[in-house]
Amino acid sequence: MRILVKISYQGSNFLGFQIQQHGRTVQQQFEKILKRMHKRHVRIHPSSRTDRGVHAIEQYFHFDTELNIAPDKWQYAMNSALPDDIYVNEVSIVDDDFHCRYDCVGKRYRYKVYQGKHRDVFMSGLKTFYADSLDLEKMNEAAQQFIGTHDFTGFCSQKTEVESKERTLYQSEIIKTENGFDYIVTGSGFLYNMVRVLVAFLIEVGKGKRQPEEVPILLEAKDRKQVPFTAPAEGLYLEKIYLAPQELINDFGPDIKIHRKKSLEND
């Protein structure tokens, strides 16, 4: 039986989602619980492998089990054993051929920035602080130019190891907030550090150091050295996982390009 689990977590005190040889991870927390229940190792398969310090409002994973436990009982058992910075929102039974990575057709991230004269210690780990004044209109103009299907070689970590660095973005926009801004980006998938590199570039645009007109040129150049900065992990939230094409169509219309996963991605 295949079980699908929908979770949220505050990522400040995790080394990321994926299991690490030394250190606290989200995967480690769940596999420890499942091992105790099954008396053997049970591997979980996530929709996304978030990095150290990255939060998740909506994240999924699946696992296989022979235990005859109702979904609500799974939820109760896990939440009873989990630390305060992880929560199971929902558990369901899915078809045996369902896969959290391969059936994921899209993801939405939100990057939160607050501004002001002074850093707020109570925002530490939850939002990124920038004291500089930023031109949000120009930032949004630049952000819009990332929408569509592009090769994002110049906007990801040089450690990215995938055959194709082409991704489709359905949404890329700057939203003004009460004390700063959010960057919201929805796409077919994301390369390693891609969202954080996009944010760092947009902030450079906001400072007047780069121009929106440079986006097509930089995409064509495919040279990370021309976009050298990466925004901090704090402030980055995995906000939504799209597990069905219809969900994407509902949000972005019937004419969008939908990608089916054939191999594992960096995120």
Swiss-Prot record:
Enzyme Commission (EC) number: 5.4.99.12
Catalytic activity, reaction form: uridine(38/39/40) in tRNA = pseudouridine(38/39/40) in tRNA
Active site feature: 51
GO biological process: tRNA pseudouridine synthesis
Keyword tRNA processing: yes
Pfam families associated with the record: PseudoU_synth_1
Keywords: Isomerase, tRNA processing
The UniProt record lists the keyword Metal-binding: no
Binding, substrate: 109
Domain of life: Bacteria
GO molecular function annotations of the record: RNA binding; tRNA pseudouridine(38-40) synthase activity
Coiled coil: none
Function per UniProt: Formation of pseudouridine at positions 38, 39 and 40 in the anticodon stem and loop of transfer RNAs.
Family per similarity comment: Belongs to the tRNA pseudouridine synthase TruA family.
Record note on quaternary structure: Homodimer.
Protein name: tRNA pseudouridine synthase A
Originating organism: Staphylococcus carnosus (strain TM300)
